[in-house]
Amino acid sequence: MNKYIVEFIGAFFLVLTIGFTVIEPGAGAMAPLAIGSALMVMVYAGGHISGAHYNPAVTLAVWMRGRCASVDVPGYMIAQVVGAVIAAFIVLLVKGNPTVQAGTPNVVPALIAEFLYTFALCYVVLNVATSKNTSGNSFYGWQLDLQYS
């Protein structure tokens, strides 16, 4: 299977799972487990084909480490964004106009949290999926699941 299609599928199902579990309240503690589990199975399904980045930040980190060819980076990122956007539209189509209880926007703390957790995700990926010390380790999927959950 084409590595760009794998990135599209992985990002699609990750965002689809997020959309179906957290858009409206009620999933509780199951939402992070569902999201992490969806990521885990997609990593196991596509890791051997594309590296299973499923996130442009992860692709950038893996490229900076020298484990992703420069020629693949734009294709990976386009596939990930297109997959995520299509999944978001499907969530909107299925759920209609969901009622999201949003508080007062607080941009700076949100950006700080996003940066820190994206850093943590990239850090885990670089240390469990791209390190020479863990070559042959096929258990990185559940480690990403735990970090993502």
Model regions and ranges:
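Membrane-interface helix-loop junctions and terminal tails of multi-pass membrane proteins
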Residues: 1-149
